[in-house]
Design a protein with these regions (language model features):
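Hydrophobic alpha-helical positions that pack around
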Residues: 29, 43, 47
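Active-site-adjacent beta-strand/loop module that shapes the phosphate/pyrophosphate-binding cleft
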Residues: 64-87
Length: 134
């Protein structure tokens, strides 16, 4: 799986609410890599499918074992490159760019999504060992 944190400018981050989660938690864009697809292609495809925007300047950040369904989450950072937010409503119920100091509720500490958001919005370092980072 790929999980991506998308920034716009120097102080905005894209966060999205999963349509299947009743809690008001905003997380990151994530999805499965398709057969024959590179990780970068998966990031671009999942981003466009789920929120309708283009991204550029992809950077690998870290990985985290994900037990359901026996996967590995590969974390990327990307920059907004264009397009209007158009939601894939069966996956995403809301998405917006939030100022770093005006974030909604985000995923729990210990999740790779939380660590990625803290890295981008508060400058927390990415550890060489992701388990130490989390």
């Amino acid at each position: 799986c790929v999980i991506t944190i998308i920034t716009r400018g120097d102080n905005e981050v894209l966060l999205a609410k999963n349509a299947r989660n009743p809690r008001p938690v905003y997380g990151l864009i994530a999805g499965f890599v398709e057969v024959g697809e590179t990780l970068e292609e998966a990031v671009r495809r999942e981003t466009f499918e789920e929120v309708g925007i283009q991204v550029k300047n992809l950077q690998y950040l870290a990985s985290q074992p994900w037990p359901f369904p026996s996967n590995l989450m590969l974390a990327f950072r990307a920059e907004y490159a264009g397009g209007d937010l158009v939601l894939q409503e069966d996956e995403i119920s809301d998405a917006a760019f939030f100022k770093f100091d005006e974030l909604p509720e985000i995923p729990f500490a210990g999740s790779i999504a939380h660590a990625m958001i803290m890295h981008v919005t508060q400058g927390h370092a990415v550890a060489d060992d992701t388990k130490a980072w989390l």
